[in-house]
Amino acid sequence: MEDFVRQCFNPMIVELAEKTMKEYGENPKIETNKFAAICTHMEVCFMYSDFHFINERGESIIIEPGDSNALLKHRFEIIEGRDRNMAWTVVNSICNTTGVGKPRFLPDLYDYKEDRFIKIGVTRREVHIYYLEKANKIKSEETHIHIFSFTGEEMATKADYTLDEESRARIKTRLFTIRQEMASRGLWDSFRQSERGEETIEERFEIKGTMRRLADQSLPPNFSSFDNFRAYVDGFEPNGYIEGKLSQMSREVNARIEPFLKTTPRPLRLPCGPPCFQRSKFLLMDALKLSIEDPSHEGEGIPLYDAVRCMKTFFGWKEPIIVKPHEKGINSNYLLAWKQVLAEIQDFEDEKKIPRVKNMKKTSPLKWALGENMAPEKVDFEDCKDVSDLKQYDGDEPEFRSLASWIQNEFNKACELTDSSWLEIDEIGEDIAPLEHIASMRRNYFTAEVSHCRATEYIMKGVYINTALLNASCAAMDDFQLIPMISKCRTKEGRRKTNLYGFIIKGRSHLRNDTDVVNFVSMEFSLTDPRLELHKWEKYSILEIGDMVLRTAIGQVARPMFLYVRTNGTSKIKMKWGMEMRRCLLQSLQQIESMIEAESSVKEKDMTKEFFENKSETWPIGESPKGVEEGSIGKVCRTLLAKSVFNCLYASPQLEGFSAESRKLLLIVQALRDNLEPGTFDLGGLYESIEECLINDPWVLLNASWFNSFLTHALR
């Protein structure tokens, strides 16, 4: 093949092709088919340009060799064949003088008559497949594409072939001659089969060896090689393909692609019914902490010791009374369970006698609250398979609930700043590479914005509770263990602080599978009067257990202290994820980082410092009925963190389904906003799949409400 190339092509073209291949680290003596392809491509580019000039009236004319053309301007600027730096210099110069947009990839020619760059393609395959590959790669309407094949076919953008028929015929004849010459030497088959998509001199990542074999083995049916599959994917036109498939289907399938217009989407239908209720595993904005500053007592750090010290800071205990009963529960049992906790803690008269772990006596109220002996008896299937009316339990249909205002209030509160710092980030060594320095800077800025955020408190509280509960579930399977709900933070002055939110009593926990459930009773302190929002506390039995004296602007005020009690349950897999709630920090930091990267790529330098320190700039935070809400970069950080934390606290199948399905509609709306003229079919089916997830979950209902606000404002 190398000998053929040197005989068949002009020595100048051969020399340029050799230089080009060496520039990209390729050897013409080894990659002979590529050598031939580059020479062919260059010759076509030169033939395209030959004899074409522009006269003084700006008209394109053809002047044969030998005729005078000294005063005429060449119609085409040849870019192909120049070294890469020079080629880009020529392109930039043309863009500056003509105002034409700069192409993403090096073109082959510039047409001064039509004022456009041209990409020439020469293919040994079908022209339309190669044309689509080029178009998909270039993704620009400003660069004109013209493809020739060795069989005499051609294809060009909008069927505009630029040259007269005679000039194009000359190129096709030359290609046909090259093909015949190769065939007569037995070189054509090898040359034809060697084409792998792009054969021009652009860089290409080549897969070789084991990876190549794996790629060829890992293909859908009907594809013989990875290259065929890639060519198919590159040339894939989704809308046309879908319409084609629909036309082949049964006549019963009645699906037409409809244009998606501003007037097309409707709001999501939120369910009606009683207001939704609080279902998180622990109280959020309504939680009350009993705290000790600078703890230095004996056994400091042992949860039970810390809890006893925190309990001793409060002197307003009183005889508990039920102020809000649970409709279906035996509320007196919850009352007796709290009395039992108080009594067993008060038994530790001398602090030196406090045990490291406290197992509660298995009293009747606790057994009831923890569902002891309530599970139906398991019978071996072999013993009952002949029972004629054997059937599965009828599951109750979930009751539809409407959106309540408390969940928006919870979210707003989670975005707020507290007066304590909840994050202790470990030192991770000195930065060495510049990238590490940027990463540390971003982490430090982000940490400063979110360390005092209430959502961060929820993370640390969730990590502690889930870790303690999982440890107890594995270490004391048969015991009703008392687990204090504790968190640790630092005050504004930097003093350490230990907080007690309440207690958990764990039930029997023989957890074999990840989804096996352990029951627990949570008892949490609060100053929130439940009678203000009774619907929020449907699952709770609430006691008044004391009076707390608070300092206010008008002096000291006594407020009733409540205990929110409920039976709840969790599983190993839920506790495992709860222990990893710190991931929420990482997720929201990555979202912020993508915003910084977008800004940095526009400014062509790292914008981290400017991003966080420009306090005057506001950023979109989310949608509300009023429109797009904006705030400082700190508010954006805290809002993104709160969303991530709530996704964790309110994780459910409803949230999974809503997120996956609503994303599809969101992408369609975004495509419409980007003027991409999206088309849809069975939009009603998509709405159905979104709305079947809107049942009773407060966080999902709030997200659906936000989605409706987005639809309203996005399509104005």
Curated annotation (Swiss-Prot):
The keyword Metal-binding applies. A motif (Nuclear localization signal 1 (NLS1)) lies at residues 124-139. Its main location: host cell. It is found in: Host cytoplasm; Host nucleus. Its cofactor is Mn(2+). GO terms for biological process: cap snatching; DNA-templated transcription; symbiont-mediated suppression of host gene expression; symbiont-mediated suppression of host mRNA transcription via inhibition of RNA polymerase II activity; viral RNA genome replication; viral translational frameshifting. Its EC number is 3.1.-.-. Phosphorylated on serines and threonines by host kinases, including human casein kinase II. Mn(2+) 2 binds at residues 80, 108. Belongs to the influenza viruses PA family. Plays an essential role in viral RNA transcription and replication by forming the heterotrimeric polymerase complex together with PB1 and PB2 subunits. The complex transcribes viral mRNAs by using a unique mechanism called cap-snatching. It consists in the hijacking and cleavage of host capped pre-mRNAs. These short capped RNAs are then used as primers for viral mRNAs. The PB2 subunit is responsible for the binding of the 5' cap of cellular pre-mRNAs which are subsequently cleaved after 10-13 nucleotides by the PA subunit that carries the endonuclease activity. This is Polymerase acidic protein.
